[in-house]
Amino acid sequence: RNYKSPRSNLSELRIVLLGGRWTGKSSAGNTILGREEFVTEGRTAQCVKRQREVAGRQVTVVDTPGWRKSWSVENTPELDKQEIVHSVSLCPRGPCALFIVLRVDASFTETDRRSVEEHLELLSKTVWRHTIVLFTRGDRLGDRTIEQHIEAEGEALRWLVGKCGNRYHVLNNEMRGDVTQVTELLEKVEELVARNSGRHFTVGERMESWEDHVESDRLHCNSNKFITVGIH
């Protein structure tokens, strides 16, 4: 079942969109804000932040560079990883929610699952308390419900949805005029904030994780140097 909880009525909401390339992050940002704020042609190379009043709330959306589908975090360019980590700093006091953006018409394999997990945990191991799965291209569901899609897609997608506390939402980016889908999304963000007792994802959580990642890379490099010296 989709997540339902008492919610806080907030005047300001801050959202970060994360996910692989070509999943529809920029289009989702435009749908949420109700106008063309993000460029949808070509690849997003740097974080982009846009703000607008939506349904009586001041909404901030941060779009981020996507990683290649199925890529391990080790294969993702360092600049892209830095931008992903930087994204939360663009939200004063931290984002209220981080959306993992997936296309409803694309398969989601175990390799995809590991890729999402690795990239999300660049931010923190605790990031999952603040995440919601956002499915784009909702029109491709046809007669199926999103619950039927999640069940049919397999264990990898069910794991991801479960890891996000069974929080998910569907957007049809072809129906920008449908304000209900956006209002319901914002309400789910408010429910998430209420569940977290008003806490947002903090920069402190993010920095601790990034420092661990940098230290791991340093040790890996030193290990490789040691092996090289040993060979010679």
Question: Would you name each region that the model predicts?
Answer:
Residues 1-61, 69-79, 90-93, 107-132, ...:
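C-terminal non-catalytic interaction/localization modules
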